[in-house]
Amino acid sequence: MKRVVVVTGLSGAGKTTAMGFLEDLGYFCVDNVPGSILEELLKLFMSSDLEKMAIAVDVRSEHFSDPVEAIEKIKKKTNALIVFLEASKEELLRRYALTRRRHPLQRNDVGLEEAIEKERQILLPIKEMADFVIDTTKMTSHQLREILGQSLMNQSGGISVRILSFGFKHGIPMDADFIFDARFLPNPHYVPELSHKTGLDREVEEYFKKYSLVDEFVYKIFEVVNVAVKEYQRSGRRIVTVGIGCTGGRHRSVYIAHKIAEMLKKEGFSVVEKHRDLEKV
């Protein structure tokens, strides 16, 4: 079965990294295709021996007068997977300062910050039609490749659920569909013999088992996520990200994320369990 992936999103959010990864996976990669030859390109691909093609679409308007229309055309012709990459304004400003490259919408009368916000508004309709929205603000290139690979692996195999623990003091994951706050639960950080351990350690698990409130919270999260994921699956959604946060991201959120992941696996879902801030102080 032929597979088409469209990589789009904000300039500076990681499209080059994503396209390089897809090329490594054997995709025929096409960047900055003129809109006038897009339809012909799709016809050639569908009739060729190529199995996988990735197309990068952005706001370079001399090539795509309407990026939304271009992606709708690709989707209609190929049932493509749409990957939308974004990052916070502050992170994009930092990246442009490092590379000293010019934003595609930047002009003499349009500064970088204004160009970033203008692009965000132009691409909002594409973000809303995307299969995957990946926020790369706090990601390394390796992490982006890992998440993109997981997304592609589940393209034809039903829905994938990402269970992500994090610490609120390190920032909220902006790509999460659900955020659950575990900061009201008892905190093993204040137990001297447990403070250096994590929510994956047996001693911490035994600590949490003393509190019925913890079990109740875990079950309530599972109930909500289980119902939501099943409905998302029926609607054709391919990935759902569930964020569970505590203060530092080492004890409460890690324990709960691990428990929820185990419960969802028993329901037959494809689950990716990540602990973003486990090694942070």
Curated annotation (Swiss-Prot):
The keyword GTP-binding is assigned to this record: yes
Keyword entries, A-Z: ATP-binding, GTP-binding, Nucleotide-binding
Residues the record lists as binding GTP: 58-61
Family: Belongs to the RapZ-like family.
Entry function: Displays ATPase and GTPase activities.
Name this polypeptide is given: Nucleotide-binding protein CTN_0898
Binding site for ATP: 9-16
Protein origin, superkingdom: Bacteria
One Pfam family recorded for the sequence: RapZ-like_N
Keyword presence, Membrane: no
GO molecular function (one): ATP binding
Disulfide bonds: none
